[in-house]
Design a protein with these regions (language model features):
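Sequence signature of WD/YWTD-type beta-propeller architectures
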Residues: 1-428
């Protein structure tokens, strides 16, 4: 967890436990902790706290300044080995470079799963992994020859998953790996000159479908494919018995976009047939509880549901007021976890496989680019989050790209990018 002091000519740091020094290091503008040294220290002090004392010598403080010490708690539970995310320049419409990347969380190694060079400059998005598996995942590629890439146990296929001339959009794998739930969204955006938020992203319509990867069939349910309601952001329960999703009554858009309030619903799922059952339960009622919900994700133990809350709409990353909210699924009690939220949009998130960690996208640093933050979760509470570590901490500021759609992975994705490129450029 390297860190720095801007403008420093020299930095000294002392890690200590119970008043005894554990590790002492020095550096120029930042502290570069040797990887092996860091790992050994974490292993030695699992479940305990370390005090961190930092001193710096700067132009303003040529004789040095001692900063107030702080503590870090070393979690006993490990985090998943990798995190995947889309790396894209901040903006609204145009781009010339984007990629879905994977980062080794035990080092600073970052490698591409796919870049839009493989897709002739087209959009690549909506990656999703089955139970965090690096061998079973999917992503969309939008361009000539594009489609949905599905990888199962090393076998790669390109599928055209669409209904009513609209492509499948936001995905979530069923935990047994056979089915994928999608919302089919007709996404648009409007720009404003008189508002704090200069852009609003909305759906003209959105429905739910279930895709069967074994039979290559799309399963529709007329209850979730009408013009009265708009459904989006499906998410299976960890046991696979329920499908959660967001739903809002249809409005005249973009004129009524401020009235769009998405609730969270839950419906039984038949694991054998892929069909949705009854009853349809309301987990979060936006019209009673206020605001609008997006990105529901259930903890691996099935006890909690974490979602992104905004005052309205379905694209919280463009809402500065958006924050993460937690529902206890046993009591249905709604919590605002203050430790994890901060000023600036907090949005897409993912649970680790053991349910002890959450990664989420946030614009809390400067309001324009999106960074990744990690938070430890224990006894229904989040601990203070920290940003994705970099070898040089300045990279998070100097790298003018947004990280979005973070998803934990249990291991490294080994992908034949040449084969994927050939598949995406083929019309078949």
């Amino acid at each position: 967890l390297n860190f720095g002091v801007r403008g420093a000519k020299n930095i000294r740091v002392i890690f200590s436990h119970a008043g005894k020094s554990v590790l002492e290091l020095g550096g120029d503008e930042y502290i570069d902790i040797p990887t092996q040294t860091w790992r050994e220290m974490l292993d030695s002090y699992k479940g305990r706290e370390l005090a961190v004392n930092v001193a710096a010598w700067t132009k303003e403080h040529p004789d040095g300044i001692q900063y107030k010490s702080f503590t870090i708690h070393i979690a006993e539970e490990a985090i998943d080995g990798y995190v995947a995310y889309r790396l894209i320049p901040p903006g609204y419409i145009g781009w010339n470079k984007m990629a879905i990347m994977q980062r080794d969380l035990s080092s600073f190694e970052e490698t591409p799963i796919i870049t839009n060079n493989e897709n002739e400059g087209g959009c690549i998005n909506c990656h999703n992994f089955c139970q965090g598996s690096p061998n079973r995942y999917m992503l969309h590629a939008r361009n000539k020859g594009g489609g949905t890439i599905i990888v199962k146990d090393g076998k790669m296929e390109k599928k055209d998953i669409a209904i009513h001339s609209h492509n499948a959009t936001y995905p979530n794998w069923h935990p047994d790996g056979r089915f994928i739930a999608f919302s089919v969204n007709d996404v648009h955006q409007s720009f404003y000159s008189h508002c704090v938020s200069k852009i609003e992203v909305f759906d003209n319509f959105s429905d739910l479908i279930i895709y069967d990867t074994q039979t290559d069939q799309v399963i529709e349910d007329e209850r979730f494919a009408d013009t009265l309601q708009m459904e989006t952001f499906p998410a299976f329960s960890p046991d696979g018995k329920y499908l959660y999703f967001c739903s809002s009554p249809t409005h005249i858009l973009p004129f009524d976009v401020d009235s769009m309030a998405y609730s969270i619903l839950r419906v039984p799922f038949d694991i054998k047939t892929g069909k949705l059952g009854t009853p349809v339960d309301t987990v979060y009622n936006a019209h009673i509880q206020g605001g609008s919900a997006s990105h529901p994700r259930i903890s691996p133990d099935g006890k909690y549901l974490l979602f992104a809350w905004a005052e309205s709409g379905t694209f919280p990353i463009q809402h500065p007021e958006s924050e993460l909210m937690l529902i206890d699924l046993k009591t249905n009690k709604l919590y605002k976890p203050d430790n994890i939220n901060a000023q600036g949009a907090d949005s897409y998130h993912s649970w680790s496989s053991n349910g002890k960690w959450v990664v989420f996208a946030s614009r809390r640093i400067e309001g324009r680019t999106t960074n990744l933050f990690f938070a430890y979760f224990i006894n229904g509470q989040f601990c203070k989050p920290f940003m994705l570590p970099q070898a040089n901490p300045e990279q998070n500021v100097q790298r003018f790209f947004s990280y979005n759609v973070p998803e934990f992975i249990k291991g490294k994705v080994d992908v034949d990018r040449d084969a994927m490129s050939a598949m995406l450029q083929s019309k078949k």
